[in-house]
C-alpha cells in the first residue's frame, strides 16, 4: 500500500510539472478576461467615439 501511495504522488508531481511547462506558467490568462467596454453609450456612443477619434468634421455634433 505504501508503494502505491508513493507511485501516485510521483505521477501527480510529474503531471503537474508537465502542465506547468506546456501551459502558461505564471502568465495571466488574458484570453479569459472580459472585454473592456470602449463604447458605454451603445451604438450612438460608438458612432460619436469614432467621430472624436477621427477628428470630427461636424463640430456641433461632436460634444
UniProtKB/Swiss-Prot annotation:
Pfam families given in the database record: Conotoxin
Superkingdom, taxonomy of origin: Eukaryota
Propeptide feature ranges: 24-54
Major subcellular location class: secreted
GO CC, one annotated term: extracellular region
GO molecular function: ion channel inhibitor activity; toxin activity
Modified residues (Cysteine amide): 62
Record localization: Secreted
Keywords: Amidation, D-amino acid, Disulfide bond, Hydroxylation, Ion channel impairing toxin, Neurotoxin, Secreted, Signal, Toxin
Coiled coil: none
D-tryptophan, modified sites: 58
Cysteine-cysteine disulfides: 56-62
Expression sites (tissue/organ): Expressed by the venom duct.
Family: Belongs to the O2 superfamily. Contryphan family.
Role played: Its target is unknown, but this toxin may modulate voltage-activated calcium channels (Cav) or calcium-dependent potassium channels (KCa).
Name of the protein described by the UniProt record: Contryphan-P
Top-level taxonomy: Eukaryota, Metazoa, Spiralia, Lophotrochozoa, Mollusca
